[in-house]
Every structure is written in structure tokens, then in C-alpha cells.
Amino acid sequence: MPKVMGMNYQYKRLDNNNFTGNSLDDFVRHQTVTECWRKIDNDWKLVPNVYEENWSQELCREIAEDVVHHINLDQTGFGAFDGERIIGFATVSHRIFGAAARYVQLVCFQISENYRRQGIGKKLFSMACEEARRLGADKLYISAHSSKESQAAYRALSCTPVEEVNEGLAAAEPFDVQMEYRL
């Protein structure tokens, strides 16, 4: 797919006026994965793991409905828009957890395929961090996709391996890499 370049993207807090159950109908969540990070013998290693990840329209609608539900209940969401079309989004949980630090979770963080590598993720991540600070957190907790590319993106944002693992989040996504960002 051709990359879309533009500088007139708008960034907004998500609400029922700008985000609905159909908002992700044109969203392209595609990733070709060739290698993933895995913890082997207590050490992180990059291992071959070839697959394609694609969100169907049905899954896009399920995720959109879930985002709508949570932004009305217990999360704050931010979106990047190209006109009326959402091209990236991030959500932050309002629940603070952790014993040694005060964490809030970055629940969703996605950029539509044709819009990646343009700074959209960096801007949405910054907005999510600002919200986490406002909520009183010390750190943002991220259960991050383990692919080589996803991990490179998180590390470029200065995310590091988590110091205090949330066992529930780790168990829910056992192949994710648990990461954090100090606010």
C-alpha cells in the first residue's frame, strides 16, 4: 500500500462525537512479522517467527466498540485524524497499580499502516504520557507486541523493560514484552 504523507493531521481527545463503532472501518492494522523477542533461559533473544497480522473489518469494529465503551467508562483516548478518518489512536487506563511505582497502562496504541514513520505515534504517545501524569502516575505500563519492528518503535520512544511486572497483564498476553516509560 502506498504511504500517505501529510502534515495537516489533527490530534484530538476521543469522544462519542469523533469516535464510534465504525471509526476503524478504514484502519489498516497490518504487520508482516519475521522475528520476535522471546525470553529464553532468562535472557531476551530475537528468534524467527514468521506470520502476517491483519485486522478484519469485524475485528476493527469489535476493537472500536471496545474503545467507545472504555472512553465512556475508565480510559482516556487520543486520536490522530486525516480529515475525518482516524489514522492512529492510543488509550490510557485510569486505574493506577503497582507497589514500587505508580503505573497506568497504555491499553491501545496503533497507527494505520500507510501513516507509520511520520511522527504520528510519537505525538500520540506524548499525549498518552501527559494524561498518565495528570492521573498521578510515575510510569506508563506497556504490554508491547514482541515483533522486532514493534520493539524498535517502543525503544525509539525510550521505553525500557518493566521493573515491576503486572502478572495479570503478562498472563493475558504471554508473548508480549512488558515495558515501561518513566514519566
Regions found by a protein language model. Give the residues of each.
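Structural motif
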Residues: L135, A156-L157
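Conserved catalytic-core motifs of GNAT/GCN5-like acyltransferases
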Residues: Y141, S158-V177
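Conserved GNAT acetyl-CoA-binding A-motif
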Residues: A132-H145
